[in-house]
């Protein structure tokens, strides 16, 4: 990564703290439930409607830790815009926004990249904490993006 500073939003999924580029996040909303859609792909928890936009919800806990059962009652949704359209990422907690120098980003070791391929793009030490930088474009695989478009759940939101 370049030497310039990057603003990241920190959030918790399970016991780990992850970060996303703040520019990828359009809005943060409380999770009050989602509507299940019978034709939706299995990786979509449901949909919400936000300002007349239908937004598919992906539970990052399920994506990152399929066997973890414990739930957070006060989950939040990070509304993000991706090449597949707007997607809501359900997380356990949003913590804060941090500025990180570009030279602080470290490549993940090969064994750790196994969190579904290229989803984890950097390890970011910051003070006493270690953040895991995920790529919002890779939350869904290429096949899942096609499946999502075919289900027509995000396509209407790609031009916003």
Question: Predicted regions span which residues?
Answer:
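An acidic, low-aromatic, low-complexity terminal/linker signal
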Residues: 1-160
């Amino acid at each position: 990564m370049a030497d310039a500073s990057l603003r990241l939003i920190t959030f918790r999924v399970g016991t780990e703290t992850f970060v996303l580029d703040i520019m990828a996040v359009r809005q943060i909303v409380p999770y009050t439930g989602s509507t299940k859609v019978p034709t939706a792909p299995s990786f979509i928890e449901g949909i919400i409607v936000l300002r007349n936009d239908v937004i598919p919800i992906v539970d990052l806990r399920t994506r990152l830790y399929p066997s973890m059962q414990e739930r957070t009652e006060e989950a939040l949704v990070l509304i993000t815009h991706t090449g597949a359209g707007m997607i809501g990422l359900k997380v356990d907690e949003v913590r804060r926004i941090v500025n990180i120098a570009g030279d602080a980003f470290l490549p993940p070791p090969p064994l750790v990249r196994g969190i579904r391929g290229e989803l984890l793009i950097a390890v970011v030490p910051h003070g006493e904490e270690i953040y895991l930088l995920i790529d919002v474009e890779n939350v869904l695989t290429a096949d899942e993006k096609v499946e999502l478009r075919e289900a027509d759940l995000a396509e209407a939101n790609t031009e916003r």
